[in-house]
């Protein structure tokens, strides 16, 4: 069979197969064109999930008749001329409009700002139907109908209308985050589904619009520079995490990307702070010389290739970890919100209050006795947390008492320990509930990690070695890494078949559950690649040791111990979450407490 030149229409349809995969792909290309035209207002309307109708209107620079005719031809563009090494626009190939026109019914109405009138061009199945004058406002309106009517086989690969509409919504969100100075409106068949007013330079305000106020309340600002690359954005605190990676947004020179290198760097930065199966929330913007990044490596321009990927990864990991360390003990606010939603009033409306020993109905002659802490400050008996009975006559001071010094700390002053596991502390504007085991586990881990890096991890010799019985293959694995474990202060040796003797443990752990620790370490080492050694996993091993050497649930603490724990949390990086990524404390504001009692 002889080789022959393909028709222009078929060439465009082939290109459309790569560039226009679904309605969301068309929406992305049209929004990019609007942004490149300098638009400050972009409206997107859809019907049938974008398959029946996709309309993008903008107030950009507009086009005249000559521009319109060229715009629907392949590789005609105003954005580049001779080189791909200085791309400063979102689009640059000149493929989007001809590709869309080859598989759909396309019409474009446009008018330049300095022109008295506009023009309209229509393309169907790759053929220009007409080009004529038309009434139009300054800017451009692109209307795509019956997407893939010319290639019906493609329709079989599309998802439901709801799924396709959801994909368009996600595209609009990403563009809105990248361009806060632009107003975006997305409407469906019968209603406006999204509206993001312009926020100017207020990037966090735009993120609150798109990602919700919870992200704004739990975000840490990023601002770092390494050589010629700048990183800005916001990263959520580790305890503010999600069940998938859909809430990770990355932008390179303003271009939304889903680059594997960037997403991998985000995971690496949070590796020790969130549990397996959970994903951080982050918005990263990387700015660099266009010559240092290749954006022409993917048909949809969703991937990029950096000239120095190691530098970019190091910048991301370092910036996020530094920000998390800077905010130290901060935890997500969502825990308190969840707690508030779970609260119910003590007595439902219109219900009869149960008769109790303290109710007015059964104790009308009984003198009023205030609850402990109202009439008289209690003297806590730590072991049982028993409180003396308050005096019958409440003693109220006409002037509010000065706040105790401890209450002025971020995590407040310890007031009680409940269920031998949770510390209740009073702050200046609310209260904090701390999980003592999770908090101490994080503190121990950070201390071990610091000592490990400084090569000053001391060990304590056990008076009587602990003998742990485990399977022979686990013994072999542990002994293979005995030298590396000794760096963490854990000295082990063989004690006959199927047994390990623990001679020394890290001094900072105090009393250690050696049996549980050895068994868990054996399981973890079996799960890892034993041939690679533990050098890259020492911090994970330290986290395991910290868990087994922390204050256990059920241990009663003295008030001074509780306050000491709170003070140490305030100065320890990452103390807002334990080594497994769970929160170590929940804060409840006074305004939230008042709302529970209907005071607000």
From Swiss-Prot:
PANTHER family associated with the record: DNA MISMATCH REPAIR PROTEIN MLH, PMS, MUTL (PTHR10073), DNA MISMATCH REPAIR PROTEIN MLH1 (PTHR10073:SF12)
CDD domains: HATPase_MutL-MLH-PMS-like, MutL_Trans
Coiled coil location: none
Function in brief: This protein is involved in the repair of mismatches in DNA. It is required for dam-dependent methyl-directed DNA mismatch repair. May act as a 'molecular matchmaker', a protein that promotes the formation of a stable complex between two or more DNA-binding proteins in an ATP-dependent manner without itself being part of a final effector complex.
Annotated InterPro entries: DNA_mismatch_repair_CS, DNA_mismatch_repair_MutL, DNA_mismatch_S5_2-like, HATPase_C_sf, MutL/Mlh/PMS, MutL/Mlh/Pms-like, MutL_C, MutL_C_dimsub
Any single GO BP term: mismatch repair
Biased composition (Polar residues): 349-367
Keyword Metal-binding listed: no
Superkingdom to which the source organism belongs: Bacteria
GO cellular component, one term: mismatch repair complex
UniProt protein name: DNA mismatch repair protein MutL
Region annotation Disordered: where it falls in the sequence: 327-405
GO molecular function: ATP binding; ATP hydrolysis activity; ATP-dependent DNA damage sensor activity; mismatched DNA binding
Family that this chain belongs to: Belongs to the DNA mismatch repair MutL/HexB family.
């Amino acid at each position: 069979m002889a080789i022959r030149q393909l028709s222009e229409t078929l060439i465009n349809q082939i290109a459309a197969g790569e560039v226009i995969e679904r309605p969301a792909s068309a929406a992305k290309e049209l929004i990019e064109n609007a942004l490149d035209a300098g638009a400050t207002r972009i409206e997107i309307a859809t019907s049938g999930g974008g398959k029946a109708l996709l309309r993008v209107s903008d107030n950009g620079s507009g086009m005249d008749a000559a521009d319109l005719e060229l715009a629907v031809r392949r590789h005609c563009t105003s954005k580049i001329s001779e080189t791909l090494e200085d791309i400063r626009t979102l689009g640059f190939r000149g493929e989007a409009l001809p590709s869309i026109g080859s598989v759909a019914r396309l019409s474009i109405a446009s008018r330049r700002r300095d022109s008295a009138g506009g023009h309209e061009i229509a393309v169907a199945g790759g053929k220009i139907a007409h080009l004529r004058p038309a009434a139009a406002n300054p800017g451009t309106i692109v209307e795509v109908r019956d997407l893939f009517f010319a290639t019906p086989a493609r329709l079989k690969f599309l998802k439901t209308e709801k799924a396709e509409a959801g994909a368009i919504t996600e595209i609009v969100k990403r563009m809105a985050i990248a361009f806060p100075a632009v107003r975006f409106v997305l409407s469906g068949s019968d209603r406006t589904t999204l509206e993001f007013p312009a926020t100017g330079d207020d990037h966090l305000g735009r993120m609150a619009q798109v990602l919700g106020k919870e992200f704004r309340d739990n975000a840490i600002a990023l601002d770092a520079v390494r050589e010629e690359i700048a990183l800005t954005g916001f990263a959520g605190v580790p305890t503010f995490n999600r069940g998938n990676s859909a809430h990770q947004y990355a932008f390179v020179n303003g271009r939304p990307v889903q680059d594997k290198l960037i997403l991998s760097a985000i995971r690496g930065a949070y590796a020790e702070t969130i549990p397996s199966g959970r994903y951080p929330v982050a918005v990263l913007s990387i700015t660099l010389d266009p010559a240092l990044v290749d954006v022409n490596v993917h048909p949809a321009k969703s991937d990029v290739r950096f000239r120095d990927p190691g530098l970019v990864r190091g910048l991301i990991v370092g910036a996020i970890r530094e920000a998390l360390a800077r905010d130290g003990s901060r935890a997500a606010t969502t825990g308190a919100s969840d707690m508030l939603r779970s609260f119910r009033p003590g007595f439902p409306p219109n219900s009869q209050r149960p008769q109790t020993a303290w109710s007015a109905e059964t104790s009308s002659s009984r003198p009023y006795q205030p609850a402990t802490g109202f009439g008289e400050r209690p003297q806590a008996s730590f072991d049982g947390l028993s409180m003396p009975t308050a005096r019958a006559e409440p003693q109220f001071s006409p002037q509010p008492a000065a706040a105790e010094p401890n209450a002025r700390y971020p995590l407040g002053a310890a007031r009680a320990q409940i269920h031998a596991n949770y510390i209740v502390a009073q702050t200046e504007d609310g209260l904090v509930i701390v999980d003592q085991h999770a908090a101490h586990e994080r503190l121990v881990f950070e201390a071990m990690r610091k000592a490990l890096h400084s090569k000053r991890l001391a060990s304590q010799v056990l008076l009587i070695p602990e003998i742990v019985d485990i399977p022979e293959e686990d013994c072999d694995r542990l002994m293979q890494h005995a030298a590396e474990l000794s760096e963490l202060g854990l000295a082990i040796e063989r004690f006959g078949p199927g047994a390990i003797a623990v001679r020394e443990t890290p001094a900072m752990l105090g009393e250690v559950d050696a049996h549980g620790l050895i068994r868990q370490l054996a399981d973890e080492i079996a799960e890892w690649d034993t041939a690679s050694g533990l050098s890259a996993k020492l911090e994970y091993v330290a986290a395991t040791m910290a868990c087994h050497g922390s204050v256990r649930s059920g241990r009663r603490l003295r008030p001074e111990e509780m306050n000491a724990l709170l003070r140490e949390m305030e100065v320890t990086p990452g103390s807002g979450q334990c080594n497994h990524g769970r929160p170590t404390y929940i804060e409840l504001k006074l305004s939230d407490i008042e709302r529970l009692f209907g005071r607000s």
